[in-house]
């Protein structure tokens, strides 16, 4: 019986540590992580265009314009030709929004040719649906709605 209890409580303890670690990673590490990948489409030519894509900023009280500043600085260090934001600017616009500071931060993004934005699922609902396009346009982004640019 004692052996069973040791195994049982050892298993429960291990599961609690594992679950706690996953929750900690999901809320405290992953949201602040920046990943960078470089893809080469044609190695036979010296012509290239650098595109930086970012998304899912999910701005909220504990990830605000100060955190966005770090992302903007990282983007600008890449010297992009084109920047594409693929949606989900705010986490929940009805609960938290700081448009003035967010616009100022997004305006700092430098791109040689264009800054492009598309809508994410969190940009289409709630108060964000009425503000997203305006925020991105004031930030210097071309907002696409089921359309293309270029050829």
Sequence positions of predicted segments:
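Short solvent-exposed loop/turn micro-motifs enriched in small/polar/acidic residues
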Residues: 32-34, 140-144
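N-terminal membrane-anchoring alpha-helices
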Residues: 1-45
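Membrane-embedded segments
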Residues: 47-142
């Amino acid at each position: 019986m004692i052996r069973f209890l040791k195994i049982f409580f050892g298993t429960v303890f291990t599961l609690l540590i594992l679950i706690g670690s996953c929750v900690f990673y999901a809320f405290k590490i992953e949201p602040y992580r920046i990943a960078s990948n470089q893809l080469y489409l044609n190695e036979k030519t010296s012509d290239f265009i650098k595109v930086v894509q970012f998304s899912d900023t999910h701005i909220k009280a504990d990830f605000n314009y100060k955190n966005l500043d770090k992302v903007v600085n990282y983007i600008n260090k890449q010297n992009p030709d084109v920047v594409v934001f693929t949606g989900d600017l705010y986490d929940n616009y009805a609960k938290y929004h700081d448009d003035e500071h967010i616009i100022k931060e997004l305006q700092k993004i430098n791109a040689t040719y264009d800054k492009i934005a598309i809508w994410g699922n969190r940009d289409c609902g709630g108060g964000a649906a009425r503000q997203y396009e305006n925020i991105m346009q004031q930030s210097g982004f071309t907002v696409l709605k089921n359309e293309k640019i270029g050829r």
